[in-house]
């Protein structure tokens, strides 16, 4: 494991614990021996108020490679979400998470999670990852929002 990646992730964890957006979760997983695994984080993103996503808390796994922060983490909703920019596997399709697009080593975990929250309600139809959600979003917005609200209810923390 890269010392650079671990040191950066330890800094990220410290910064997150000191200050993070309300309702969001980002916690490194534990190894079988009880030690912290900074390369694998369990996160949760709340649906934004005033949107069909409101009320939901959407669980996401963030996996870091040894060359982080040179390469972005892989962000994957578990279970996968109904959304035009979420692959059927749950992986998020977002330009800041792609090395050959808008990824920059200075981007923080907080910025990634806020960016994904923004993407939930504002899909990028230029870069679809899920055919069904994309088609319904483009052809029947009322049905799309109905499904999103049902999903938010299903993933409500209460």
Swiss-Prot record:
Primary location group: nucleus
Enzyme class: transferase
GO cellular component, one term: nucleus
Site (Interaction with RANBP2): residue numbering on this chain: 4, 25, 57
Domain named UBC core: residues: 4-157
Record's keyword annotation contains Cell division: yes
EC number, as in UniProt: 2.3.2.-
A GO biological-process term: heart looping
Protein localization: Nucleus
Marked site (Substrate binding) residue numbers: 100-101
MF term (GO), any: SUMO transferase activity
CDD domains, per the entry: UBCc_UBE2I
Function: Accepts the ubiquitin-like proteins sumo1, sumo2 and sumo3 from the uble1a-uble1b E1 complex and catalyzes their covalent attachment to other proteins with the help of an E3 ligase such as ranbp2 or cbx4. Essential for nuclear architecture and chromosome segregation. Mediates nuclear localization of vsx1. Required for progression through mitosis during organogenesis.
Subunit: Forms a tight complex with rangap1 and ranbp2. Interacts with vsx1.
Family named by the database record: Belongs to the ubiquitin-conjugating enzyme family.
Protein name per Swiss-Prot or TrEMBL: SUMO-conjugating enzyme UBC9-A
Organism: Danio rerio
